[in-house]
Amino acid sequence: MAFKPKIPIALLLLTSLLAICAGLALAMQDPELKQCKHQCRHQRQFDEQEKEHCQRSCDEYHIEKKARERAERRRSEEGSSREEGYEEEELGGEREEENPYVFEDEDFETRVRTDEGRIQVLEKFTKRSKLLRGIENFRVAILEANPQTFISPAHFDAELVVFVAKGRATITTVREEKRENFNVEQGDIMRIPAGTPVYLINRDENEKLYIVKILRPVSVPGHFEAFHGSGGEDPESFYRAFSWEVLEAALKTRRDQLEKLFGKQTQGVIIKASKEQIRSMSKHEETTPRIWPFGGDSTHPFNLFHKRPSQSNQFGRLFETDPKECKQLQDLDLMVSFANITKGSMAGPYYNSRATKISVVIEGEGYFEMACPHLSSSGSRGQREGSGSSRRRSRSGPSYQQIRGRLRPGMVFVAPAGHPVAVIASRNKNLQVLCFDVNAQGNIRFPLAGKNNIVNEFEKEAKELAFNFPAREVEKIFRNQDQEFFFPGPSRQPEEGGRAFE
């Protein structure tokens, strides 16, 4: 009797549901996502796992739809006229409607997705704007993994720095025929050299693992890939790219056995592991002292939160790696910092002399404001839903546009060198921001407010000439604030689209 495959009714229902939602897209915007999830939750034929999978599919469809809309909008804008002029030509004629310094969910590509987690990679910075070409060869990626999961081995054609934002993991690397296991936790930073085989587990039984990575490609500028040796069909093993004759000779194994080995794995990059497997892989941590970053050539992780904060008061705390101490980050010209801004408070304004700051929002909400001299005054820059607004004033000499962006968990924003910036937490919750400073060597942070602000260092005559205002009054204003770096935030936070940022 011929075999007839049976398609589960739950799969048919899910396919039909997504098709219905795709039809609704013509008439609806965000409400379609809400409707899709509502339908998922009320499907009686679905068990809880199928309902969760259905809702994740809704999210994925919604993100892909937003990305398509953005791509279509960009294509239509390419045909629009651009202002002539040397400066604008040199900067790539920046006339996009989007705020070029803020990145949201739809700006991430999902490279890995399984039932147990996902890996997202932020688009290349210069895809958004040539203004960001100074950080073109850096990429940001985010790993999320469910409790007690295994992330399969891979190596990357990029230098890799990881920061454990949430959870507990065991990271295993193989170098020079030596395996090293490192139990890491929230606040740990670890450098993984290009080409190093690495795999990890989420060893926590309850908490999700959330790791933020910054990568500097070493092969193709601005592009990187993960190479999976261990695997089969999903993840695909790079061994499968070789002929069977070469594999038989190299591994000294018959083809039929090789076909079984490299065709077995179909579960994906992030898979569930048993408690026994997790326990076994997490108990072998190396006992070599963690001497990094205070000299030596160790590859051990270093916990940022075990250092004393470089700035601390009731309005926030700032933890920073010192480029002079962190020898492993020196050749990358990179510094890592973490700001915890108390709810209702703010950091800055300040600017960096050399470093461009790439910031990832970990927890909380708020917004940032930045002064930018590069953007066109025509149009309304940054009028992106949920992101920002902008303003530019015409003056004799340099003119600065206000860049403002709303901040939520998972968002990325960039403050280029020399650009004055302030970050404000909502009044409801602390705002936690992870920062990677590119071009960190020799960088100086110049405060524009607080007891050590740069104006206080000006000579009396310089103050009068610069502001066309009595020096005494200038000093009174700039010496009013006796705190440093972190300050009380605005008493009234701005609104966007009729709703307050908080």
From Swiss-Prot:
Expressed in seed (at protein level). Residues 85-100 have a biased composition (Acidic residues). CDD domains: cupin_7S_vicilin-like_C (cd02245), cupin_7S_vicilin-like_N (cd02244). Keywords: Allergen, Glycoprotein, Seed storage protein, Signal, Storage protein. N-glycosylated; paucimannose-type structures containing xylose. The record marks R73, R74 as: Cleavage. Belongs to the 7S seed storage protein family. This is Vicilin Jug r 6.0101. It comes from Juglans regia.
